[in-house]
Amino acid sequence: MNYKDIINACILSGVFLLHSPSALADTPSVGVSKGQESLQPAAEGNLWQRLIRNVSLAWNSPHQELYIPVNTWHNRWTYDDEKIASYNERPWGVGYGKYRYDEDNNWHSVYAMAFMDSHNRVEPILGYGYQKMWIPGEREGWRFGAGFTASITARYEYHYIPLPLPLPLISIEYNRLSLQTTYIPGTYNNGNVLFTWIR
């Protein structure tokens, strides 16, 4: 593991995150209270327009969060023991995001993260995340979420060519601490990874 690679990937991811398209920069921000923002009904416009609006509102939100990758688990039913032994399952790295909760308490975020992949190479990722949140009635401070991320990543073995990566998301939150995870599907000895981080 080369610390210079991690630092460079973090800087590169941060630069990508800080350069938003002009369409996002021109969107006025809305009233904010404790991570929640009121907005016009989400049913306005087509799917693409709603996505752009949600990305814009998350981008303009004053709320920030830190992402800390904690585990990369390779599905033992889909890998040879030899492959498992050769893989890194501690994805050292860091990430940064801007987030908001909408009027239905659903989570929206734009983020960038860089971490050490299964081969101990730096992997940057940036994207938009959405989760429909469920708040149990009697459990103050708890939230459970399920949703998706529409992201772009780049990997060493593909010469860091940007690759689209839509993935599912689930999380368990208590107050502002969240354990969030995704599953990367794949074939035998490839993919099938449960990636988990704290935010």
From Swiss-Prot:
The record marks 188 as: Role in the phospholipid gating. Its EC number is 2.3.1.251. One of its GO terms (molecular function) is O-palmitoyltransferase activity. Pfam families: PagP. The record marks 83 as: Role in lipopolysaccharide recognition. Keywords: Acyltransferase, Cell outer membrane, Membrane, Signal, Transferase. The keyword S-adenosyl-L-methionine does not apply. GO terms for biological process: lipid A biosynthetic process. Residues 1-25 form the signal peptide. The active site is at residues 74, 117-118. Homodimer. Belongs to the lipid A palmitoyltransferase family. Transfers a fatty acid residue from the sn-1 position of a phospholipid to the N-linked hydroxyfatty acid chain on the proximal unit of lipid A or its precursors. This is Lipid A acyltransferase PagP. It comes from Yersinia pestis.
